[in-house]
Regions:
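Active-site-proximal loop/turn and secondary-structure-junction residues that shape catalytic pockets
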Residues: 14, 42-43, 84-88, 130-132, ...
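Mid-to-C-terminal alpha-helical segments outside catalytic/metal-binding sites
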Residues: 6, 152, 244-280
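Structural preference for beta-strand elements that scaffold enzyme active sites
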Residues: 5-9, 35-37, 77-83, 123-127, ...
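Surface-exposed, active-site-proximal loop segments in enzymatic domains
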Residues: 48-52, 88-103, 135, 139
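Divalent metal-binding pocket/active-site signature
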Residues: 18, 106-193
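An N-terminally biased module of ancient metal coordination in phosphate/nucleic-acid-related enzymes
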Residues: 1-79, 119-131, 136-141, 165, ...
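Well-ordered, non-membrane alpha-helical segments in soluble/globular domains
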Residues: 21-23, 50-69, 101-115, 143-148, ...
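Short acidic/histidine-rich active-site segments
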Residues: 219-238
Length: 280
């Protein structure tokens, strides 16, 4: 991989409590990676049980700490994305006896806290979504309300919203909700996408079949590992070296234009971030 080619992992987790964030970022950089978006892990995986709005800050602050660790390896080339994992609603309702409306209100309050970090410049973007697994109609409705609240915040902040949703290539309804709140479809990013997505920008999991589908489409896309930094699941979902290695593979397969699209054009259009690589 050419040294002046930026390589972005659009969705990666670093765990300062249980994981080895510095080692993970070093592996990414050694493989040719240059830029990272670091997302907070679900609060419960960090040992944080949220009962009130302010409880979300502990997980957010730990994620910022992990991003600062990443910046020691990649100076100025790592950003934080904060929000509330959509699976929290099931944890609250099924395991902790919250009413659905109470769970929704707490999750919306957590997003309000995340929005404060974006407004202060401590985070680049928000994350939200809805469960990717079967839930009741009541939970699905509440989850969509949380998602729309996140879109409203993104519109107010003029920032990107990353989404964790069901496996789908059609988020056109979400794109309509976004437009109603002043958010363009391209600034709604579908995490763990398997190819192009209607109504959002695809952040494609860096597996070969999924990347071929994205590269062949001519649509804007990003690449991600969804790395968990979990010692009990080493390398899950994909290891930190994967995006730079897959970018190299795409070039070898004749998809050089797609690599530029995923790592230069789309990040600039969607996030407005500077992906220049300092000379060595």
């Amino acid at each position: 991989m050419e040294s002046d080619t930026p390589i972005l992992d659009d969705h990666l987790h670093l765990d300062p409590v249980n994981g080895k964030p510095r080692e993970a970022v070093a592996d990414f950089a050694q493989a040719g990676g240059t830029h990272l978006l670091v997302l907070n892990k679900p609060s419960w995986t960090l040992g944080v049980d949220v009962d009130r709005k302010e409880d979300f800050r502990e997980g957010f602050d730990r994620t910022i700490e992990a991003t600062e660790t990443a910046k020691q390896v990649l100076p100025g080339r790592a950003w934080t994305v904060l929000g509330v994992h959509p699976g929290l609603i099931s944890r609250l309702v099924d395991d902790r006896d919250f009413a659905v409306d109470g769970a929704r209100e707490l999750m919306e309050a957590g997003l309000d806290v995340a929005a404060e970090y974006v407004a202060e410049g401590r985070a680049l973007a928000l994350k939200s979504g809805r469960p990717h697994y079967p839930v009741s109609d009541e939970v699905r409705k509440a989850s969509n309300q949380v998602l729309r609240h996140a879109l409203s915040l993104a519109g107010e902040l003029d920032c990107v919203l990353q989404l964790h949703t069901e496996d789908t290539d059609d988020l056109s309804e979400v794109g309509e909700w976004a437009a109603e709140r002043g958010v363009s479809e391209e600034r709604v990013v579908k995490h763990y996408a398997s190819g192009p997505v209607s109504g959002a920008t695809a952040s494609v999991i860096a597996r070969k079949d999924e990347l071929r589908a994205a590269a062949d489409s001519d649509e804007p896309f990003l690449m991600e590992t969804d790395f968990l930094d979990d010692p009990d699941r080493p390398g899950a979902v994909l290891g930190p070296k994967t995006v730079p290695r897959r970018a190299r593979w795409l070039r070898e397969e004749g998809y050089g234009e797609a690599v530029e699209r995923a790592h230069v054009e789309t990040p600039a259009r969607v996030y407005g971030i500077d992906l220049s690589v300092p000379s060595k």
